[in-house]
Amino acid sequence: MSSFYNEAKFLISDGEQMRIDTYAVGRKTMQQSDAFKGTFYENFTLVYALPLSNHDNSSLMLIAGFYALLFMFGTCGNAAILAVVHHVKGQDPRSRHNTTLTYICILSIVDFLSMLPIPMTIIDQILGFWMFDTFACKLFRLLEHIGKIFSTFILVAFSIDRYCAVCHPLQVRVRNQRTVFVFLGIMFFVTCVMLSPILLYAHSKELVMHEKVDLDQEVITRMHLYKCVDDLGRELFVVFTLYSFVLAYLMPLLFMIYFYYEMLIRLFKQANVIKQTLVGRRSGGEEKKLTIPVGHIAIYTLAICSFHFICWTPYWISILYSLYEELYQDTKSTASPPTYAFIYFMYGVHALPYINSASNFILYGLLNRQLHNAPERKYTRNGVGGRQMSHALTTNTRPEYSELIAIPSSSCRPDSRVSAMIHNNNNNTESLPLAQNISNMTNKDSATIVPMPMSANVDGNEIYNWITPDTESVIL
């Protein structure tokens, strides 16, 4: 098949001329096309033309510029979080077993990958057609939907991890690295199964916009373009949309609300118990520093759920609207084309998931106390003048949820609750009744555990070691 590239003019049926320049215009004879063999047009020459680009559309260029800013903001931000996590793990060996940092790291990787399709989206917006092949189309759809599904699954796992850290602090196996990676592997497998129809059917599809036949010159001029489409078919599209809505939006949203709500309820109860325990032992200013910042945690948690809800709800409403049109389009006698305002509005709606992926690193990374305070903890654990500070039983366990046991940093493994209790029994005889009470309670439901009252033999100065400024690190 021979082809050439030149400037051409495309004649619209009403006589209006549309200039086709800077684009390829291919030509081939009908003798080389199986579609017209044995027909009247068998010896006609077929000329292909591409439509004009949208570079002169100022509104669309503004949208493309906004997408470009999202791409730079999201990729740079998530890459910066990955660099910070790598630095923190290098400075503090204990953080290598930190499940919170693991979730933040995986979330940043997924959000970074979900930003990669944005340049292809911008090119498609400006040109008005898909300029890449089918393989690029499949890769584009895969990265786009991974950010929409797998990223949401990670946020749910993150909420479960924080819930377990607060409400079930003694369940160590639930929050170790092996369990986290098994959980992430299962979620990734479920994501791949959900996206299998996209991988099978997504391709670059040719769309013929207009065709004109010149009988005198025996030429057929066809204006066409390519679009990256899922092409699932009506039945499969309905099934795919419904189970994606339920599994990737509705259930994750309900899970996040439930686990964060239960976590806040437990924090309010624990804060009241700790406040009653510390009454009269310290001055008002010092006592305020030792309380749990429940209000700050509640605002932060509400911001997480609200931001996720705001970004994803309009998108899924638009998806359900397209599903409604797919199911009931046969009952419509006439279908008017969408207005420009509606098109621009839909561009904004579909930009919201990208905004969510580009901004997750702020809520889950920059606002996380473990990333903020990790360099400080490295130098403050040794203290001034060689004084060692105590830390919680595990990297992520808040001291007040570890029954207020003070554990020296160099005594035992920081991730071993059993060794911590043994150490307190052997070396701190004054706290023996407290340790025995905790040992007797380990077989009970951790949801019923509350801080035990301090005995009269316990030095009040140790409160600063039991409740440090890092007490909210697992939450924030």
UniProtKB/Swiss-Prot annotation:
Disulfide-linked positions: C137-C228
Similarity comment text for this entry: Belongs to the G-protein coupled receptor 1 family.
Gene Ontology molecular function: any one: G protein-coupled receptor activity
Keywords: Cell membrane, Disulfide bond, G-protein coupled receptor, Glycoprotein, Membrane, Receptor, Transducer, Transmembrane, Transmembrane helix
Stretches of the chain found on the membrane's Cytoplasmic side: 83-102, 161-179, 258-291, 356-476
Membrane topology (Extracellular): 1-61, 124-139, 201-236, 313-334
Record function comment: Probable receptor for neuropeptide ligand nlp-9 that plays a role in octopamine signaling and specifically, the octapamine inhibition of aversion responses in olfactory sensory neurons. In AWB olfactory sensory neurons, required for the detection of preferred food sources.
Gene for this chain: npr-18
Subcellular location: Cell membrane
Domain of life: Eukaryota
GO cellular component terms attached to this protein's record: neuron projection; plasma membrane
Source species of the chain: Caenorhabditis elegans
InterPro entries the record matches: GPCR_Rhodpsn, GPCR_Rhodpsn_7TM
Positions annotated with a glycan in the UniProt record: N43, N57
Knockout mutant characteristics: Defective octopamine signaling characterized by reduced octopamine inhibition of the aversive response initiated by ASH sensory neurons when exposed to 100% 1-octanol. RNAi-mediated knockdown results in an inability to distinguish between different food odors.
Record carries keyword ATP-binding: no
CDD domains recorded: 7tm_classA_rhodopsin-like (cd00637)
Protein's UniProt name: Neuropeptide receptor 18
Matching Gene3D superfamilies: Rhodopsin 7-helix transmembrane proteins
